[in-house]
Amino acid sequence: RTGALYHDIGKLKNPAFFTENQSGFNPHTPLSFEQSAQIVISHVNDGLKMADKLRLPQAIKDFISTHHGHGKAKFFYNSFCNKYPDQPVDESKFTYPGPNPFTKETGILMMADAVEAASRSLKEYTNESISQLVNRIIDSQVADGLLRDTPLSFRDVETIKATFIEKLKTIYHTRISYPELNKNGKNDNSDEKRQ
């Protein structure tokens, strides 16, 4: 739990560059996609420097260093590729330094961090949109090999996905859609039909 609380301390160096701290002006606007990616990526090394200065234990530093693994700053990477489809891309400018997570706990944090961040960009919070988001984010991490150094099994990953989906539904208060009454005034899903 402590690792989860401290994993993003590096954002304190340049807080305005992270969406959760922005209101109004976006400081990324005048920058290139590569510059923006480098600023965002630097929060990992900035966090490790802070952790060293504060003499935090190695277990906490492991959460800081691995919570993006060797993943990409996807927003800026995808934006660059979409804007400049004919230009070669220097992937190193969009890639976190790693290492990839190597314990169950650091792997779970990586998944939780990515899912939580992506969930804030959903246009609507329905059971379907939340489920699709969680599956898309975590399946992408698995496909990119970001979790291969952890002891997490496929069954573990499926359990984690289901837990995240339920938690996000609770956070965003998704509701079940209630059935309509049919023309004769009876509910199609009434208890009478079930008995």
Task: Kindly give the residue locations of the regions a language model identified.
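Long, compositionally biased intrinsically disordered regions
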Residues: 112, 125, 129-195
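Divalent metal-dependent catalytic cores for phosphoryl transfer on phosphate-bearing substrates
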Residues: 1-127, 131, 140-144
